[in-house]
């Protein structure tokens, strides 16, 4: 069935930019900047739906489930970007948050013709992951009508997985297909139909909230410190030390000693210092409290 794209908000013309090709560079950028300021407010309007999705993802993680993003083009790339940042930031397994893009890995750098129109591909990509009812699938598409994503959402619902959609058009097909509809309506783009702009920015803000919120709820943040960060490069090794110092008030030397005694596991080092435990005692207490530092400190 053909869709009249001109009826979509994301495909409509923006009256603020109809003469943008006649403006000076600074005037052009002012128009873009003014339009961008609308994005955060659009996201604010859908915080309840984002919160509901965060809670669903947190519950999935607690039950051994995964978060799977699905999208085509820019939307798919944003999902992959968000997923790829979770292991170094929060020490998660690469399979805990997964990003799928229509057309596969080659589509990350180069568009794959007709991939987004393939309903079956969306279903097959999820089947290849051995999706279960414990997983959460989040479909991403500015238009809210991408067949690849709709196919995935349909399959996910059929096996009992929780589904959510992120789109920038009201009353779209994806909103109806998902258990939770996140619809930040950002309005027409500065360049008509260029949904990598405001719509893409809104999607990125929502994705930031989904994984950050779920990781906080899963005990991977103490205060506002990323206490499960892994030491995969020199910058992150130094960040680990700084995190332990900030969390405990210890000196850098004390922080380094604790980290070196526990294979540079931030949570363990923090608990060692704050609760005056050795590495094995701290690891054991953390495990007993599912990795939550505050609970381990209270030890109730």
Curated annotation (Swiss-Prot):
Annotated EC: 4.2.1.126
Annotated keywords: Carbohydrate metabolism, Lyase
Gene Ontology terms for molecular function: carbohydrate derivative binding; carbon-oxygen lyase activity; ether hydrolase activity
Annotated pathway: Amino-sugar metabolism; 1,6-anhydro-N-acetylmuramate degradation; Amino-sugar metabolism; N-acetylmuramate degradation; Cell wall biogenesis; peptidoglycan recycling
Pfam families in alphabetical order: GKRP_SIS_N
Catalyses which reaction(s): N-acetyl-D-muramate 6-phosphate + H2O = N-acetyl-D-glucosamine 6-phosphate + (R)-lactate
Enzyme class: lyase
Every SIS domain range: 57-220
Record-level GO BP terms: 1,6-anhydro-N-acetyl-beta-muramic acid catabolic process; amino sugar catabolic process; N-acetylmuramic acid catabolic process; peptidoglycan turnover
PROSITE patterns: GCKR, SIS
Domain of life from the UniProt record: Bacteria
Leader sequence segment: none
Active site: 85, 116
Comment field (misc): A lyase-type mechanism (elimination/hydration) is suggested for the cleavage of the lactyl ether bond of MurNAc 6-phosphate, with the formation of an alpha,beta-unsaturated aldehyde intermediate with (E)-stereochemistry, followed by the syn addition of water to give product.
Subunit structure and binding partners: Homodimer.
Protein role: Specifically catalyzes the cleavage of the D-lactyl ether substituent of MurNAc 6-phosphate, producing GlcNAc 6-phosphate and D-lactate. Together with AnmK, is also required for the utilization of anhydro-N-acetylmuramic acid (anhMurNAc) either imported from the medium or derived from its own cell wall murein, and thus plays a role in cell wall recycling.
Family stated for the protein in its record: Belongs to the GCKR-like family. MurNAc-6-P etherase subfamily.
Protein name (Swiss-Prot/TrEMBL): N-acetylmuramic acid 6-phosphate etherase 2
């Amino acid at each position: 069935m053909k869709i009249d794209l001109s009826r979509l908000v994301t495909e409509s013309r923006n009256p603020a930019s109809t003469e943008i090709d006649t403006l000076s560079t600074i005037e052009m950028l002012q128009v873009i900047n003014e339009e961008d300021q609308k994005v955060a407010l659009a996201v604010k309007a859908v915080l309840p739906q984002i919160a509901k999705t965060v809670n669903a993802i947190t519950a999935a993680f607690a039950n051994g489930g995964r978060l799977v993003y699905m999208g085509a083009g820019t939307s798919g790339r944003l999902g992959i970007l968000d997923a790829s940042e979770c292991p170094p930031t929060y020490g998660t397994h690469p399979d805990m948050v997964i990003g799928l893009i229509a057309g596969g890995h080659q589509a990350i750098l180069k568009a794959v013709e007709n991939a987004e129109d393939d309903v079956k591909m969306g279903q097959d990509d999820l089947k290849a992951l051995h999706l279960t009812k414990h997983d959460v699938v989040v479909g991403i598409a500015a238009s809210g009508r991408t067949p690849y994503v709709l196919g995935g959402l349909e399959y996910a619902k059929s096996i009992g997985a929780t589904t959510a959609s992120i789109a920038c058009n009201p009353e779209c097909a994806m909103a109806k297909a998902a258990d939770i509809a996140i619809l930040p309506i950002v309005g027409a783009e500065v360049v008509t139909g260029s949904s990598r702009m405001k719509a893409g920015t809104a999607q990125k803000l929502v994705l930031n909230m989904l994984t950050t919120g779920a990781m906080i709820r899963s005990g991977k943040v103490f205060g506002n410190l990323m206490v499960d960060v892994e030491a995969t490069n020199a910058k992150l090794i130094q960040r680990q030390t700084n995190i332990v110092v900030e969390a405990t008030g210890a000196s850098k030397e004390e922080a380094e000693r604790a980290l070196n005694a526990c294979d540079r596991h931030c949570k363990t080092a923090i608990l060692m210092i704050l609760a005056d435990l050795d590495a094995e005692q701290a690891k054991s207490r953390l495990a007993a409290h599912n990795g939550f530092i505050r609970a381990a400190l209270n030890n109730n």
